[in-house]
Each structure stands twice: as structure tokens, then as C-alpha cells.
Amino acid sequence: LGFNLVLSWCLILYTLMLERTRSTSPPSDFKGKGKSETLGSALIGWSTGLIILSFAMTALIFITFPRFGLGFISLNTSYSPIAGFSDTVTLGDVGKIKQNPAVVMRVEYTQGGEIYKPDSQIIWRGVVLDHYNGRTWTSTLATEFETRNRPGTGLNLFRVSNPREVVQQNIFMESFNAPYLFTHGVPLFMDGNFIHVQMDKNFVFKTSDPRSGPRKYTLISDISDHDVSYSLDMPQNEPLLFPSRFLQLPDISSKTHDLADRLTQNARTDENRAQKILNHFADFKYTLEMENDPGKTALEHFLFQRKEGHCEYFASAMVVLLRSAGVPARLVNGFVGVEWNEWGNYLIIRQQHAHSWVEAYIPGKGWTVYDPTPPDPSLVTPNT
């Protein structure tokens, strides 16, 4: 505000001085007419009004910019890739991007037409990875479902037998080289400024449309935690039709297999096994500074020596232990949303919020989320 005041007055004085030098009327013409006081009052009033108006407009633009600017203005046109997000995950890569505060998405939540503020920790699902070669995770599932979206009409996706927490999410995504359409919860409906929509058997959504600027799309999702009845032509128990895909392991050490056996030896169900493996990481610590023993794989060094790492190590280790114990599991890469903007009432997701977690298939419950990573101090973000 102070800057606006000084700048405005400087511009006004400069204009007056400029007009004075341009004037051809002699100064005597203005003497004795009693206008100076009136002119000064009017000038002060008009300039003050303009300053107040400019400040109000600035505040309005600041608050509403995420709602309009990201959807329709070409931002970040260099299409730089998100360093912490790709369709593969290699141990150690996340450490380089967690300090990057660049904004990836802004998300507005509404429920029944009213502003909805979700819980502080929100996971935005991006890509699911099922194959591990000892260092890198990749996806081997082909596209299962492909259709054309008519912007303004949208697509009905899943249906939920007993919806309990249905919200609308308006997503404004920056330009970057990633075709994925991130989702939070079970997506029931999707619409956006894209035509082609694809989904694989891991329920990962993406578009093959060429990028022409920031992406804007709307989701209606059920963000409660319950079983899902699929509206797509896929049986409910399909994950069990190809369990080997989610039990695949590279050649890992007998020490790792022994750890999985020891942790789950008294567990009677897959849910118990998953919980016992999750509990094993309770005393591990979070760090971005990774060290590797040249004589061991990065994962073994993490499990048996260092016991410190970032989310990719925790998620990778849990999936490997689950699969060794016979529990189908997969690694998920996306973002965790923790930063809420109180001025504009929207969620901010930054590159430093990139995250990896685990989905394990539990009979009777389906794919269940487990996050073995301890809290990251950099993600404890106050409301802004």
C-alpha cells in the first residue's frame, strides 16, 4: 500500500510538472482566481480514490488469479518436466526435487455449492508402477479404456454403491510434460479442456492430447474410504486374475526374504501382514541425504544399515516386503497436498510435494493405501 501511495503521487507530480513546462499561458493568468485550494482538494480526492481502487483491484486479482489465470493464460510455456514425477521411479531421484517450490496445481474444493476444506494430508494419485528391476519401478499395464471427452459434457467414470463424501474439485494444472490427470478419491465424473482420455488397469488416467498451455479440469469424486463398484466393464476381483504381476520381484537377498518372513510369521490375514510390515518402519527416519554402500543394493542398505531415506525408499521397501510375504502390492507416485490458501480457498500443490506410497490388495477391501514414510518436516506448511 505504501509503495502504491508513493508511486501514485510521484506519477501525479511528474505529470503536473510536465504539463507546466508544456503550457503556453503566462503564470499571471492564474493569479487571483482562487482556484488553487479547490484544485488541490479535488486532486487529492481523485488521486486517493485512484490509489484505493488500484489497491482493491490488486487484491482482487491476487485472490482470483488461480481461478482464471491458470486455466486460460499460457504459463510456463517451456513445458519443463516435473523433476520428481515421471512414469518411472528410480531410487534417489526425489531428493533433487523436494526443495523446488514451483507450483504444479491449484485445486478448489466445493460440496453442495459451498467451499469445502479437506483434511491437511491429501494424496493426488498420478501413476501406478508394478514392475521392479532392483533399482527402477515402471508400469507394464497397457491401456484398458479409451474414450473421447466432449468438453462441457464430461465423462461418467466409476459409481459408488453408498457415496458418503462427494466433492467437486476444480483443478488448474501448470504446463509440464506429463500426460497424467491426477485424481483424489474415487473419480465419479471428469470434464476438462481435453478430448482423449485413457485409463489403464491400475485406474491411472491420462490424455494423449498435445499440450497447448495449462490444463484445467473438473472432477466429482467420493473421497471417503470404502469399496468401489466399478461402472466400467471390469470384474470386481480382476486384480486376482493376474496376481503374479503384483508379486513380481527381482533377485533380492535371502536377508530381505527372511525379514519379510519374520515380520509376518504370526499374521493370519493379508491385512495383518500389511500392518506388521507397516509397523516395521516406525523407527526409521526421513532424510533427503542418501548414502549407498557400493557392496549392497540401495534398498538393502536402506533396510538393514541406514534406516533413513525419503518416500521412494520407504514405499519401495514396503512393496518388496509385501510381495515377499505373498501380498499383492504396487507403488504409487503422485503428490501429497498440505498447503491451503486461506485467501483464495484453494489447495496449492508444489513440486516439493511429490510423494510415493503403497497400495496393497486386501481381500474384502480391495486396493488399500499404506504410507510407511514418516512426516517430512518440509511438508508441515502453515496456511497461507
Question: What kind of feature is each model-predicted range?
Answer:
Residues 1-384:
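Helix-boundary/low-complexity linker signature
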